[in-house]
Amino acid sequence: MRLPDVVLVALGGAVGSVARYGLGLAALRASGSGLPVGTWAANALGCIGIGIAVGLAPSDRVRLFAVVGVLGGFTTFSAYGAETLALWTAGRPGWAVANVLGSVVVGVAGVVLGLLLGRAVAA
């Protein structure tokens, strides 16, 4: 690991983490459902972002900052797992299953959309 690379990842991670926090607060206020829509939104946006990055094939420095840092700080499926378990243990197994299926479908669709967008911009 080189210090300049670590700094790029750390700065990107700070940006992504703050953005994720803001999105989570906004989604919590806006949503009246029991679903963790903030996590869905973060996962979908993160998947679109990584699809765009793959399509654009950025330089190593941009990839370290934007993909590893920003997107790594912005979205993680660990929150998805914890929220699914919380729904299940709260006696809401239907919502838990909906969260699992919805996250996978939205995530894969987001990567496809992002990849197509990234390739279109790069063309």
Predicted regions and their residues:
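Membrane-interface helix-loop junctions in multi-pass transporters/channels
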Residues: M1-A123
